[in-house]
C-alpha cells in the first residue's frame, strides 16, 4: 500500500493559511501556491539517490554528490495543477512536464480524458502528478490511469489539501502510489467540496470566479 505523507513544515502551514483565506486575491493566491509547491518539491525529493563525483574547486579537487540516474516528470491535472508547476521547476529544472486534461461528464459525473501529452521516455521517468485538491479522488485516479496506460511505472501524487474520502479512493485504485499532502482536511460536504478546503483552486488561480 502506498504511503500518505502530510507535510507539517512551518512555512508550508503558514502559507497554506493565507491560501485558505477567502480574502486572498488572485495574484497573492497564485504566488502562494507557487511557493508551497516549491517547498513540497523539496520534501518530496528528499529520497532521491546520490552518487559521488569529483569536482575541481578554486582551491583543490573535492569529492561531492549529485543526483544519480533519476529522470523526473511533473504532470499537472489541467487546469488548476498548472499553478504548481513553476514552483516545482525552480528546484528541479531538469524535470520534463507532461499534461493531463480531464472534464466531468454531465450525466455520469465521472472524469473523462480529453488531452494527454507526456515525455517520450515515459517508462524511464518517475512522475509526480500534481493538483491543488484531492476531493472525491476521481480526477486523480483517472489521471494516473492515463499515465499507466502509456507505460508509466513510478508515480507519486502531490496536492495542497485533501479529503479523507479522496485519499481512500486513490488508495483503492492505485495502491502503489504514494500521496503527498500539505493538509488533510475534515471531509467532503454534500456538494463534494473539501471542508474547510480553500474554495475552487482553478477559479482562485486564474480569477474566473
UniProtKB/Swiss-Prot annotation:
Keywords: Allosteric enzyme, Glycosyltransferase, GTP-binding, Magnesium, Nucleotide-binding, Transferase. GO terms for biological process: UMP salvage; uracil salvage. GO terms for molecular function: GTP binding; magnesium ion binding; uracil phosphoribosyltransferase activity. Binds 1 Mg(2+) ion per subunit. The magnesium is bound as Mg-PRPP. It holds the Pfam family UPRTase. Allosterically activated by GTP. Gene3D superfamilies: 3.40.50.2020. Uracil binds at residues 194, 199-201. Pathway: Pyrimidine metabolism; UMP biosynthesis via salvage pathway; UMP from uracil: step 1/1. It is an enzyme of class 2 (transferase). It comes from the Bacteria. Its cofactor is Mg(2+). 5-phospho-alpha-D-ribose 1-diphosphate binds at residues 79, 104, 131-139, 200. Its EC number is 2.4.2.9. Catalyzes the conversion of uracil and 5-phospho-alpha-D-ribose 1-diphosphate (PRPP) to UMP and diphosphate. Belongs to the UPRTase family. This is Uracil phosphoribosyltransferase.
